[in-house]
Amino acid sequence: MCVICGVRPATTADHVPPRGFFKGTVGQFKTVPACSPCNNGSSADDESLRNYISAQVGKQTLGAKYLWEMGAHKSFLRSTKIRSALLSTLQEVEVLNANSSAITRLAFLVPVSLYQRVFERVTRGLHFLHTGKILPADIPVQINLLTDAPDLSSPEFQIFEKHSIAEDA
Protein backbone atom coordinates (compact mmCIF):
# COMPACT_ATOMS: atom_id res chain seq x y z
CA MET A 1 0.00 0.00 0.00
CA CYS A 2 1.27 3.50 -0.86
CA VAL A 3 2.12 5.31 2.38
CA ILE A 4 1.57 8.72 0.73
CA CYS A 5 -2.02 8.39 -0.52
CA GLY A 6 -2.99 5.25 1.41
CA VAL A 7 -5.19 4.20 -1.51
CA ARG A 8 -3.21 2.66 -4.37
CA PRO A 9 -0.82 -0.31 -4.25
CA ALA A 10 2.85 0.61 -3.79
CA THR A 11 4.83 -0.09 -6.94
CA THR A 12 7.87 2.15 -6.31
CA ALA A 13 9.99 3.50 -3.45
CA ASP A 14 9.95 7.25 -2.74
CA HIS A 15 12.88 9.04 -1.07
CA VAL A 16 11.78 10.77 2.12
CA PRO A 17 12.82 13.57 2.28
CA PRO A 18 13.50 14.09 -1.44
CA ARG A 19 17.05 13.11 -2.37
CA GLY A 20 17.48 16.30 -4.43
CA PHE A 21 17.42 18.33 -1.20
CA PHE A 22 20.79 16.84 -0.26
CA LYS A 23 23.07 17.34 -3.26
CA GLY A 24 26.51 15.88 -2.65
CA THR A 25 25.33 13.55 0.11
CA VAL A 26 26.34 9.95 -0.48
CA GLY A 27 24.81 6.72 0.69
CA GLN A 28 21.47 5.02 0.66
CA PHE A 29 18.63 7.42 1.45
CA LYS A 30 15.51 6.38 3.36
CA THR A 31 12.63 5.29 1.13
CA VAL A 32 8.99 4.41 1.68
CA PRO A 33 6.58 2.31 -0.39
CA ALA A 34 4.73 4.55 -2.85
CA CYS A 35 2.52 4.26 -5.90
CA SER A 36 3.79 5.61 -9.20
CA PRO A 37 1.50 8.70 -9.28
CA CYS A 38 2.57 9.79 -5.76
CA ASN A 39 6.28 9.16 -6.42
CA ASN A 40 6.91 10.03 -10.06
CA GLY A 41 4.27 12.74 -10.14
CA SER A 42 6.16 14.70 -7.49
CA SER A 43 9.60 15.09 -9.09
CA ALA A 44 8.90 18.54 -10.54
CA ASP A 45 7.50 19.72 -7.19
CA ASP A 46 10.59 18.43 -5.38
CA GLU A 47 12.90 20.27 -7.77
CA SER A 48 10.89 23.49 -7.59
CA LEU A 49 10.77 23.47 -3.80
CA ARG A 50 14.51 22.79 -3.61
CA ASN A 51 15.05 25.81 -5.85
CA TYR A 52 12.86 28.11 -3.75
CA ILE A 53 14.46 26.99 -0.48
CA SER A 54 17.93 27.37 -1.97
CA ALA A 55 17.09 30.85 -3.29
CA GLN A 56 15.84 31.83 0.19
CA VAL A 57 18.85 30.46 2.05
CA GLY A 58 21.53 31.43 -0.47
CA LYS A 59 25.09 30.38 0.26
CA GLN A 60 25.11 30.90 4.05
CA THR A 61 26.70 27.53 4.82
CA LEU A 62 28.89 25.09 2.93
CA GLY A 63 25.92 22.73 2.48
CA ALA A 64 23.66 25.56 1.29
CA LYS A 65 26.33 26.74 -1.14
CA TYR A 66 26.69 23.23 -2.56
CA LEU A 67 22.90 22.85 -2.86
CA TRP A 68 22.74 26.14 -4.77
CA GLU A 69 25.68 25.46 -7.07
CA MET A 70 24.97 21.78 -7.80
CA GLY A 71 21.18 21.95 -7.76
CA ALA A 72 19.11 25.11 -7.87
CA HIS A 73 21.50 27.27 -9.89
CA LYS A 74 21.78 24.57 -12.55
CA SER A 75 17.97 24.32 -12.68
CA PHE A 76 17.64 28.08 -13.16
CA LEU A 77 20.23 28.06 -15.95
CA ARG A 78 18.68 25.03 -17.69
CA SER A 79 14.99 25.92 -17.55
CA THR A 80 13.39 29.17 -18.69
CA LYS A 81 10.13 28.05 -17.07
CA ILE A 82 11.73 27.57 -13.64
CA ARG A 83 13.66 30.82 -13.91
CA SER A 84 10.59 32.79 -15.07
CA ALA A 85 8.40 31.42 -12.26
CA LEU A 86 10.75 32.91 -9.66
CA LEU A 87 11.67 36.11 -11.50
CA SER A 88 8.04 36.99 -12.30
CA THR A 89 7.39 37.56 -8.59
CA LEU A 90 10.67 39.32 -7.80
CA GLN A 91 10.24 42.76 -6.23
CA GLU A 92 12.13 45.26 -4.12
CA VAL A 93 11.08 45.50 -0.47
CA GLU A 94 12.28 47.60 2.42
CA VAL A 95 13.52 45.75 5.50
CA LEU A 96 15.25 46.82 8.68
CA ASN A 97 18.90 45.91 9.07
CA ALA A 98 20.67 45.15 12.38
CA ASN A 99 20.89 48.89 13.11
CA SER A 100 17.13 49.32 12.52
CA SER A 101 17.81 51.29 9.35
CA ALA A 102 15.60 50.68 6.33
CA ILE A 103 17.40 49.01 3.43
CA THR A 104 16.15 47.68 0.10
CA ARG A 105 16.34 43.98 -0.67
CA LEU A 106 14.95 41.70 -3.36
CA ALA A 107 12.12 39.36 -2.41
CA PHE A 108 9.97 36.83 -4.23
CA LEU A 109 6.63 35.24 -3.49
CA VAL A 110 6.79 31.80 -1.92
CA PRO A 111 4.31 29.35 -3.50
CA VAL A 112 2.65 28.04 -0.34
CA SER A 113 0.70 25.36 -2.25
CA LEU A 114 4.01 23.89 -3.49
CA TYR A 115 5.37 23.72 0.07
CA GLN A 116 2.07 22.12 1.18
CA ARG A 117 2.22 19.36 -1.45
CA VAL A 118 5.87 18.42 -0.87
CA PHE A 119 5.87 18.65 2.92
CA GLU A 120 2.61 16.74 3.22
CA ARG A 121 4.18 13.91 1.21
CA VAL A 122 7.35 14.07 3.34
CA THR A 123 5.34 14.15 6.58
CA ARG A 124 3.30 11.12 5.57
CA GLY A 125 6.49 9.29 4.57
CA LEU A 126 8.30 10.17 7.80
CA HIS A 127 5.28 9.15 9.85
CA PHE A 128 5.44 5.72 8.22
CA LEU A 129 9.21 5.45 8.76
CA HIS A 130 8.87 6.26 12.46
CA THR A 131 5.69 4.33 13.29
CA GLY A 132 5.38 1.66 10.61
CA LYS A 133 1.80 2.84 10.07
CA ILE A 134 0.17 4.75 7.23
CA LEU A 135 -1.19 8.13 8.30
CA PRO A 136 -4.86 7.98 7.22
CA ALA A 137 -5.77 10.22 4.29
CA ASP A 138 -8.50 11.88 6.37
CA ILE A 139 -5.87 13.16 8.83
CA PRO A 140 -4.90 16.59 7.50
CA VAL A 141 -1.31 17.77 7.26
CA GLN A 142 -1.14 21.57 7.41
CA ILE A 143 1.97 23.55 6.52
CA ASN A 144 2.54 26.93 8.17
CA LEU A 145 5.31 29.20 6.98
CA LEU A 146 7.61 30.47 9.71
CA THR A 147 8.51 34.13 10.05
CA ASP A 148 11.99 33.20 11.31
CA ALA A 149 14.09 30.13 11.99
CA PRO A 150 13.30 28.25 15.21
CA ASP A 151 16.01 27.61 17.78
CA LEU A 152 16.65 23.90 17.26
CA SER A 153 18.66 23.74 20.50
CA SER A 154 15.61 24.72 22.58
CA PRO A 155 14.10 22.11 24.95
CA GLU A 156 11.02 21.78 22.70
CA PHE A 157 13.19 20.42 19.88
CA GLN A 158 15.59 18.40 22.04
CA ILE A 159 12.86 15.88 22.89
CA PHE A 160 12.83 14.64 19.28
CA GLU A 161 14.92 11.63 18.32
CA LYS A 162 17.56 12.30 15.69
CA HIS A 163 17.84 9.97 12.70
CA SER A 164 20.20 9.92 9.76
CA ILE A 165 18.66 9.91 6.29
CA ALA A 166 21.92 8.86 4.59
CA GLU A 167 25.57 8.29 5.50
CA ASP A 168 26.46 11.96 5.94
CA ALA A 169 23.06 13.63 6.35
What spans do the regions from the language model cover?
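Short Cys/His-centered divalent metal-binding micro-motifs
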Residues: 31-53
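C-terminal, charged low-complexity interaction regions
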Residues: 101-169
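Histidine-centered nuclease catalytic patch
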Residues: 3-31, 47-48
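Glycine- and acidic-residue-rich phosphate-binding/metal-coordinating active-site segment common to enzymes
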Residues: 30-33, 44-45, 60, 65-72
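Exposed alpha-helical structural elements
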Residues: 47-48, 81, 85, 114-117, ...
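Short flanking/linker segments adjacent to small metal-binding domains or redox-active Cys/His motifs
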Residues: 71-112
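A broadly used, surface-exposed interaction patch
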Residues: 38, 51-67
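Hydrophobic/aromatic-lined pockets within catalytic cores
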Residues: 21, 39-43, 127
